[in-house]
Every structure is written in C-alpha cells, then in structure tokens.
C-alpha cells in the first residue's frame, strides 16, 4: 500500500474534484481509507479545511445549480434521511426529478431502505474509543473508561460474527469455497443473545455524551463524539433487529415484511483470511415506500422515470410488474415508446431447434446437479463455437453463472488452440479479478474478438458497431431461488410466485442482455439463445412462456414482418452478417 499512498498524496495536490475514479489505475481500499475521511469523521463547519474540501465544494455547487446530475444511490439516501428525520438535506431542493435506468430503482431501494452490517460497522466506534494521535504521541482514549469498553466491545462484536459464521453450511468454512458468496436466511427470533454487545454500545454513548458535554458546540472533538454516539445507536438498532427479527417471515403483513440473512463472501482479499461476514435485511414490498417517499415527495411538480427496459414486454400486461415494484400511482401517465430500430432488417433471433439436441438446463429430480450442469454447458459451448464461426468472431457471450463461464471458457480456448476457430479471433474471458473496463476496451478495439462474460456485461455496456455482431445467451437468466430476498419474495407471492416475481425479473434481465446487440440504426447483429425452453419444433422442451420471452426481446412472434425474425438455423447468421461459409471440409 505504500506506493498507493504516495500516488494518492501526489494526486491530492492537483485534483480538482477529489473523485477516486480519477485515479487510474486504481488504489487499494486500505490505501484510500488511510487518506480519506468518512462522514462519521467529518467535523463539518468546524473543520479548518472546510474551504478546500472537495465534498463541500460539490455540495455548494449543486445548491447553486439549475440542473443537478447524481446517482440513484444518493437519491435514495436523500429519501431515506428525509423519511427518518423530516429534513431532506443530502441533495439541494428540486421540483422536477428525472430517473434514468429506472428499472434498477426497486432493488437499489430495497438495499437503501434495508439493513447492512459487517464487522466494519464497529470500526468507527472502536477508532474513537482508541483515541486519535495527538501531537505525535500514542493514541489517547477520550476518557479513562474507553480502553475497557473497547476491549469488551471488540470481544463481543467478534463473538456475534463468529456465531453468524457458525450458522453457515459446513462447505462455507472449508478451503474449497472458491470465491463463492453463500447465504443463510435468518428466521428464528432470538437466535443470538445480543445483550452484551448492546450493553457496551450503551456505554459508548454514555462516554460520548460526557465528551460532547465538556466541549463547545462545533468543536471537532464534540462533533466526533456526537458522530460516534449516532453510529453506536445505529448499530444497536441493527443488532436488535437482526437478533429479534421483529417482522419475521411469518407474522408480518405483506406490505411491511422484511427478510434477513447472513452473507459469507469468500472473494480473496489481501491481509484477510476467511470469508467476510455481512448481515443483511430488506423489505419485500418496496413499492409502498417509493410511492410515499418518491412519488409523494412534497414540492415535486413531476417525476419522470425512464428506461429502455422498464416493462416486461409489449402491451398493457408489461406494466404490471413495474407499477407494483416502483409504486407508480394509479393516475400516473405511462408511455411505451416504439424502438427507433428496424429489427426486422437489422437483427435475427436464433433459438434451439430439434437438431441442436440441447439437454435440459434444469437437472432432473434426483440427478447429479453438477454433472447435469456440466453436460448442459458443454452443449452450450458447442453452440457458442458455431456462433463464433458464423459471426467470424465478433461475439459477446453472456453466462448465467461463474461455473458455466469457467467451463465454457475452457472449452472455447481449447477449440481455439486446436485451430477450430477462424484465424485471428481473440478469446477474452471475465475471470476473477479481471478489470471490466480493460476487457470492454479490448473487446471494442479488437473487432474480431470474442468476450465471455457474466451479468455485468449484460447491462451498462455499449458495444456499438461491428465488434458485437452476435450476442450469445447460455441460459434464461432466472434469478437464483437460493437468494434469500428472492426466496422471500416468492414465498410472499404464494402460488403466483412464478408469474408475479420469477418470470418478470428474468424478462427484465434478458431484455437488458439482448439490448447489447443493436445500439444504433446502422448495427446488424444476431441474438442466439441456447436455452431449449424457448426453442421451436417437435422434440424441443419449449415452455408455455416461450412466446412471452421472444416477444419481450422484440421478436416477430406473430409472423407479421415486424420485429426480429426467429429461426433455428445458425447459417442464417452468416447471411445476415455477410460472412462467407468455410470451405467444404473445414471446421
């Protein structure tokens, strides 16, 4: 981290914004935290550096602006603070709100209005108890009692997270976690006795009150003590909620029900052994919260929510899911704008036919799931190789899981090494730790390259032009039923779980993925979905919702010459893209 600290120091002397994104390449979180100040440490107007603070400069500039551009996370923080305190002071006053990519708002709102607590939540309190360095001396605790409180609070906080880890499946505690993120739902009120942690947090607030009471308002030490007291109170409320589960999954009414879970993240990190444990909680129904806090915000003249994938498909039925999730008022005006693209001329949808002999993407009951998944992914890789040949490279392949991506990448690289791909085609893979930005730039620059990636390349990625002449989808991107939030939403929906929650979420994700294909009026691209559940012809396991899936991505399901033509013939991809067939006998 020493080199990163030096880079930050040099950059800090010249930056005009203070935004971390300016640092290229990036720096470690540890180095950034060593040089940055969190909101808990900020002494506000009492800071001697107030006049040169980048955060205050940005806030002051926004207050004077006619138009303010921010992100959804900051908007939701503004709404939450307004709801909790009655004062909306995160953003300057506004009377018209335009939300882009509004399809992302519900899940981000669940996170913003939910609960997240990792071991790091205690660090700010422990830092204050430890005392800051003064005059080059060692750390000096604010009061004589702080050292004892620190010792016992740290011990009991560690015990809380150890108890959480003990509830995880045994596989999460082994050496074969392989970077996975695992979850366990909390549904037993009183599963842990948090009284000890609560006791020491109350003691923190008592000591903080002593310090704040002995200083003048605005004094930096007074502000730090007040911030510490607020943070301790936040942790107390979180611990109480997580251990008592007041809203449970059984007793609460649907509109106020919340789900709680423990998350174990096994991603490798420097200076860390074992998984990172995080407690999370989220409301199931977020629509009522958004209806009150967003659409019903006092002083607003208009709210405009826009997205290329706001609805789940054409027709009035496509608005059912977004209306409920976004809390859109009944009297709001909704408008689905036709696409500016000529999909009938510019694109092609390729789905499995009987000749593809695709196995089921879902393991039969009682079958070995791992072996079944490997068999399906191997079949997908075969189709992907045919797609790459038909498109002469120029393919973005999106996979629904890390395991499928890894296996498919191995098979595609093997085929490339054996000379089974067109000469000069470069294979790029989104491997753990790989820079998404660098992969995206390389894919765009190398027109005939192939990129195998996960969901992050299915959204917010603009590969316009010839470089993305084919989009390959290995499997319909249904959400994981193992995700605690998804499990809670499906349980709350009862017998209607598939049509109410599961299918709409898949359709929205798939629409995003397919949207990578055609970005301008001059683009020409094919979309290949390898999942036989949307296939055509006898012997293909197409589902009753196959037509809904095709309609959602703009396909010509009624054969009227409007929308993407549908075919099971990969050779039509060559014709669409103007790629010559290989010589007879060539692979």
Language-model segments: which ranges?
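A substrate-engagement module of RecA-like helicase motors
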Residues: 1-68, 73-76, 127, 133-144, ...
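Conserved helicase motor "Helicase C" RecA-like lobe of SF1/SF2 P-loop NTPases
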Residues: 400-431
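Conserved phosphoryl-transfer catalytic core
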Residues: 102-103, 107-185
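Conserved RecA-like ASCE P-loop NTPase motor core of nucleic-acid helicases/translocases
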Residues: 304-308, 393-400, 529-530
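N-terminal targeting/trafficking signals and adjacent low-complexity tails
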Residues: 528-587
């Amino acid at each position: 981290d020493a080199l990163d600290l030096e880079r930050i120091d040099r950059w800090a002397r010249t930056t005009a914004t203070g935004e971390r994104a300016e640092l290229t390449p990036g720096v470690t979180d540890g180095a950034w935290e060593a040089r940055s100040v969190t909101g808990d440490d900020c002494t506000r107007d009492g800071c001697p550096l107030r006049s040169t603070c980048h955060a205050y400069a940005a806030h002051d500039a926004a207050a004077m602006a006619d138009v303010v551009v921010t992100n959804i996370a900051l908007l939701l923080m503004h709404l939450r603070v307004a709801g909790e305190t009655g004062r909306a002071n995160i953003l300057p006053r506004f009377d018209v709100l335009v939300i882009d990519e509004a399809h992302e708002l519900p899940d981000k709102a669940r996170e913003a209005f939910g609960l997240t607590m990792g071991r790091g939540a205690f660090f700010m309190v422990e830092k204050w108890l430890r005392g800051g360095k003064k005059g080059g001396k060692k750390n000096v605790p604010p009061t004589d009692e702080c050292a004892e409180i620190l010792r016992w609070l740290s011990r009991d906080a560690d015990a809380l997270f150890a108890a959480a880890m003990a509830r995880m499946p045994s596989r999460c505690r082994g050496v074969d976690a392989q970077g996975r993120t695992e979850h366990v739902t909390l549904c037993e009120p009183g599963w842990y006795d948090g009284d000890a942690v609560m006791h020491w947090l109350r003691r923190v607030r008592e000591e903080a009150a002593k310090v704040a009471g002995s200083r003048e308002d605005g004094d930096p030490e007074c502000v730090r003590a007040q911030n510490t007291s607020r943070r301790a109170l936040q942790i107390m409320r979180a611990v109480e909620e997580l251990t008592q589960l007041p809203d449970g999954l059984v007793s609460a009414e649907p509109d106020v029900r919340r789900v709680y879970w423990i998350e174990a993240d096994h991603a490798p990190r420097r200076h860390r052994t074992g998984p990172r444990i995080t407690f999370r909680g989220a409301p199931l129904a977020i629509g009522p919260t958004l209806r009150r806090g967003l659409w019903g915000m006092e002083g607003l003249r208009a709210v405009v929510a826009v997205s290329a994938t706001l609805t789940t498909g054409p027709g009035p039925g496509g608005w059912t899911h977004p209306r409920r999730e976004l809390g859109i008022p009944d009297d709001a005006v909704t408008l689905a704008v036709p696409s500016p693209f000529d999909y009938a001329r510019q694109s092609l949808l390729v789905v499995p036919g009987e000749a593809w002999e695709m196995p089921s993407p879902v393991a039969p009951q009682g079958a070995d799931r791992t072996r079944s998944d490997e068999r399906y992914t191997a079949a997908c890789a075969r189709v992907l190789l045919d797609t790459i040949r038909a498109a002469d490279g120029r393919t973005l392949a999106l996979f629904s899981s890390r395991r499928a991506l890894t296996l498919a990448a191995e098979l595609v690289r093997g085929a490339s090494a054996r000379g089974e791909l067109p000469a000069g085609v470069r294979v790029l893979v989104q491997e753990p730790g790989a820079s998404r930005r660098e992969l995206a730039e390389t894919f765009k620059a190398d027109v005939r390259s192939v990129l195998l990636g996960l969901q992050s390349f299915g959204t917010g990625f603009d590969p316009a032009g010839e470089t993305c002449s084919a989009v390959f989808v290995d499997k319909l991107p249904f959400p994981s039923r193992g995700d605690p939030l998804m499990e809670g939403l499906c349980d709350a929906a009862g017998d209607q779980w598939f049509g109410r929650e599961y299918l709409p979420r898949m359709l929205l994700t798939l629409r995003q993925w397919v949207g990578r294909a055609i970005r301008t009026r001059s683009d020409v691209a094919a979309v290949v979905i390898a999942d036989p559940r949307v296939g055509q012809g006898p012997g293909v396991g197409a589902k009753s919702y196959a037509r809904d899936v095709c309609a959602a991505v703009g396909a010509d399901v009624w054969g009227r010459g409007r929308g993407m033509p549908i075919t099971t013939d990969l050779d039509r991809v060559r014709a669409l893209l103007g790629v010559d067939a290989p010589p007879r006998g060539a692979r």
